[in-house]
Amino acid sequence: MSSLSETMIIGLTGGIASGKSTVVEMIKEAGYKVIDADQLVHDMQAQGGRLYRALLDWLGEEILLSNGELNRPKLGQLIFSNEEMRQRSAEIQGTIIREELAAQNDYLAKKEDIFFMDIPLLIENGYQDWFDQIWLVAVSPEVQCQRLMKRNHLSVEEAKLRIDSQMSLAEKMPYASLVLDNNGSLDDLKEKVKSAINDLTSSS
């Protein structure tokens, strides 16, 4: 729940390759601010950023490209290679990410009546208490796997490994105030998002 009663904060989440980014763009087009956790992480993993320094201290220079930037594909392979590595990554990066998200949350809560936070691992990382509502973008495992393979140029095995590293859709459902089914067309999704925003503004 948001700390400022007059401000409504909505958490947006969904599995990898669920189409959440498309929903974010629709929300932005409707005029709402969205804090993007993935972009925040990307910025902090840039050369010299807080996460860049933390990852370099942990894994050493083998995760760097020749120009000094992070080798993101190699980093992903290392982290997703086993559960111990994934948990250690979550510990190291999670604290820093939470601090940065909290700062952005506090800033927008002073300026906006309604805003969104796009956090892929919102439930897995225990962010649910931050929000007045949680919107979950949902797709079938088959659609999710196909989209992830195409988007990230992964094999079936690699895609399933990344999907299986996250909480399942069934486990996330009880936390959701609203489920946006994205197994259909783009137009179907637009209508669902438009309806959800209309309901939001009419009740606020």
List each language-model region with its residue ranges.
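Walker A (P-loop) phosphate-binding motif
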Residues: S2-Y32, A37-Q39
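Generic C-terminal helix-cap and adjacent flexible tail
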Residues: L4-E6, N198-S204
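An amphipathic alpha-helix signature
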Residues: A30, Y52, L56, P141-Q146, ...
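Well-ordered beta-strand positions
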Residues: K33, Q39, Q133, S177-L178
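ATP-dependent small-molecule kinase phosphotransfer cores
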Residues: H42-D113
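Residue-level signature of catalytic and energy-coupling elements of molecular machines
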Residues: S89, F116, L180
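Small-molecule kinase domains that catalyze NTP-dependent phosphoryl transfer to phosphate-bearing small molecules
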Residues: E100-L101, L108, D129-W130, K150, ...
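ATP-dependent NMP and nucleoside kinases share a basic, alpha-helical "lid"
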Residues: A102-K110, I114-R151
